[in-house]
A protein has these predicted regions:
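Short, solvent-exposed beta-strand/turn "edge" segments of beta-rich domains on protein surfaces
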Residues: 30-34
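A eukaryote-biased signal for long
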Residues: 131-247
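Sec-dependent signal peptide recognition
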Residues: 12-22
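C-terminal motif of bacterial Sec signal peptides marking the signal peptidase cleavage site
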Residues: 26-27
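Alpha-helical and His/Cys-centered functional microenvironments
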Residues: 8, 19, 210
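Structural motif
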Residues: 39-50
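Structured domain cores in non-transmembrane regions
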Residues: 51-162
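N-terminal secretory signal peptides that target proteins for export/translocation
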Residues: 1-12
Length: 247
């Protein structure tokens, strides 16, 4: 409803009460968070990691068509660093109360300076009306800290330009109790496993010096049996083993 419509109706119906007019005007108000109705999401990120959190809000049945997304970001840094987001638990859209439904997580990592040497994995904080003891982070009192371990999985790049990596972060999520969420601090920290492994099983074979790539079986991706080893390119060099290139 536009302001022109409101005031046109006001002149047609002079008997409108001020309280009713205020209600109509509130129906056209801008989206706003509700006071101190927030929780804190904070934690630690490794060097060369970034984090984006997208809070998704939805309305009740009478406002089922309404929704809102709020985005929070922590950029890359060369050293380990912390982040802290103040996330509203609810928003008001006119006469509709929009409640936090979930927080989508995008965990970014980079392993080089080139544009293609950046990737991400996903996580999620799901807000539920009633959580169970199995959820772990929803018991009475302060929620337990959440720890996610990220691993780098390597492979030959599709264009044979070098080694490309895929980021895999385990445990980047939880179920949060809506009633216990207000004014709480949820701690979600990330670490990196120093051990890298191949993205696909049985495509590289591990030796004490590192990983050696092997030729695949015909029509398959896995190594031949017995394995036949090959070279690969990385940083404009012909390499036989990863990560040191040469034995």
């Amino acid at each position: 409803m536009t302001s022109h419509t409101i005031f046109r109706n006001r002149y047609r119906h002079a008997h409108l009460r001020p309280a009713m007019l205020g209600l109509l005007l509130s129906g056209c108000s801008t989206l706003a968070s509700v006071g101190a109705d927030t929780f804190t999401l904070e934690g630690e990120l490794p060097a060369d990691f970034a984090l984006k959190a997208q809070a998704h809000y939805g309305g009740a049945e009478s406002c089922s068509g309404r929704g809102h997304v709020e985005t929070f970001k922590e950029d890359y840094e060369k050293a380990p660093h912390g982040y802290r987001f103040e996330v509203p638990v609810s928003y008001r859209d006119g006469i509709c109360d929009l409640q936090l439904v979930r927080v989508g997580l995008f965990i970014y990592g980079r392993y080089g300076e080139k544009d293609w040497q950046e990737t991400y994995d996903n996580g999620e904080l799901l807000v539920v009306a009633k959580a169970t003891a199995e959820d772990g982070n929803n018991l009475h009192g302060h929620p337990a800290p959440i720890h996610s371990e990220c691993s780098w999985l390597f492979q030959e790049s599709k264009l044979n330009l070098g080694i490309s990596k895929i980021l895999s972060c385990k445990g980047a999520g939880a179920r949060l109790n809506r009633k216990q969420l207000r004014l709480q601090t949820i701690i979600l920290s990330f670490t990196v496993n120093p051990r890298e492994e191949p993205y696909r099983d049985n495509t590289w074979i591990e030796f004490p010096e590192g990983w050696r790539p092997c030729l695949p079986k015909e029509g398959w991706q896995q190594c031949q049996d017995p394995p036949v080893f090959k070279t690969y390119k990385n940083n404009n060099k012909e390499c036989t083993i990863y990560p040191n290139c040469t034995e």
